[in-house]
Amino acid sequence: MAHPVRVGVGGWSFEPWDETFYPPGLSKAKQLNYMSRKMTAVEVNATYYSSFKPDTFAKWREASPDGFVFSLKAHRFSTVRKTKEDMKKSVDMFLGQGITSLQEKLGPINWQFPGTRKFDAEYFKTFLSVLPKEIGTGPAHAGGGHGG
């Protein structure tokens, strides 16, 4: 089975890109629309730090062309909880904020664990057990690690 190769960046609003990547005078509100026509995917780092409303995800979907994919970074609190119950609450809160409003443009979800976390097989087994098998229209993606 062939899989498409996607090219993207981690975000779309970077001051150093104003008037270099983006055309002069392009408003911040139009940067996603422009970038999504030059690339095929984006990793949304903002979801690691904040929650968003379903309308925001829907606006992102509408601003990007067919075939474009959003890879969301799960909220930072999702991967630091100590008990299964707290893990489930955090995961459910992240998944329940309206990410399925991205519909077919919802791509992989990056569950980034702190680089300081020592490997504990039981911890990761427990964490993986609270993830749903599917979200909306596609599989729930689980990834780990903390790249430099």
Language model feature labels by segment:
Residues 1-148:
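Residues lining hydrophobic/aromatic ligand-binding pockets adjacent to catalytic sites
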